[in-house]
Amino acid sequence: MEKMNVKPAEGKLGILVVGCGAVATTFMTGVFMTRKGLAKPVGSMTQYDKIRVGKGADKKYLHYKDIVPLADLNDIVFGTWDVYPQNAYQAAMYAEVLKEKDINPVREELEKVVPMKAAFDKNYAKRLDGDNVKDCKTRWEMVEALRQDIRDFKEKNGCARIVVIWAASTEIYVPVDMEIHGTLAALEAAMKADDRQHVAPSMCYAYAALTEGAPFIMGAPNTTVDIPAMWELAEKTKMPIAGKDFKTGQALVKSGFAPIIGTRCLGLNGWFSTNILGNRDGLVLDEPANFHTKEVSKLSTLETILKPEAQPDLYGHGNDEDTQYYHKVRINYYPPRNDNKEGWDNIDIFGWMGYPMQIKINFLCRDSILAAPLLLDLTLLSDLAARAGRFGIQRFLSFFLKAPMHDYTKGEEPVNHLYQQYTMLKNAIREMGGYEADEEID
């Protein structure tokens, strides 16, 4: 296979993180500590995973960086926006995800990461009360201010390239309105008209990033780039976009475990998932309007893996909700746990002759510890995609995301099956490295 024309990863890579909370500071601290040889980036596919290339006697297993030109960790420069003014060191200490002994060796580096004023609308995250916000009269002013931030950061830090990733709170749910979100022209008109109902602040970040030549990744379940207008902008600017919602704990388990049920042709009566979480993310999600955005994302995982219309005897009849399996997701704000999220899953299945069985999963995880490597992989791979000339929705990044983006206007279904997603990821790396894609995904 002819090798793709992938530009080398030369110069500094600026990673601008929207949000300087638990996830962002855990990510930054880990990168800084790894650069000093004081920690290992465990959980990062780009740093640890190996992909088979070639077949038979010619096969070999290589790290991603030995197949494609990835940015080096030493070339990363961090920037951030946040509604709170504390620098990354102060924010990391406040979050209490990491121990002081794992933060203090890179205190100097973290203290240099000072949040720029955020483009913020309290109506989209009512539980947040920070005052480090831009004084913008309209959504279009937000866009212009954010574009200037990106230009200034790039120039000040001598960055060759920029990637923008959202690690801020979940916004209230914004349903897709094709009159506003259907075309780029309509979205721009809404921004200039200050349509605050249909244009979320996150859309201003995405618009600013793409127009400044930076890939944009949506790490929350926000609608943001999951609209035709943003797909059009990504195509116009030739920039990659990815989303939605980092796949960390319960959704990771679900996307990996549901295929076991489906592959074994077992039936499903119901799947009940509940979580407790005490960090700032949990606080925001305690607001019903914000939780609904997350609920839509978390509920989407099962329906494309265990399809009622494909196996009505096992998963119910597609047009009759009364016969489909019952799927419920809940998140409860519980401050004593802070970032240490706990998830419970009760799965009611049935087997031979319809006899019932149950599966119980109890996952005591650390939300930011699971999320941090996703930020690293998504930013490095989005930068790679841009240098490879890939633009628009990056489906190969579905592996890292809870509600993978897809062109729903054409009836396309997302791939939520973890092992199919992994094959998509590997094949994209192979192709960008000049190797053949050689594994089936269905």
What do these predicted ranges mean?
Residues M1-A220, T224-K236, Q250-A258, P356-D442:
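Metallocofactor- and cofactor-centric catalytic cores in central/energy metabolism, strongly enriched
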Residues G213-A214, M239, C265-L266:
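Short glycine/serine/threonine/alanine-rich loop segments
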Residues N222-T237, I276-E287, T304-D313, Y334-G343, ...:
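Short flexible/disordered coil segments
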Residues A242-K244, T248-N319:
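Conserved anion/nucleotide-ligand pocket segment
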Residues T293, S297-I393:
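Glycine-rich, aromatic-lined ligand/substrate-binding cores of catalytic
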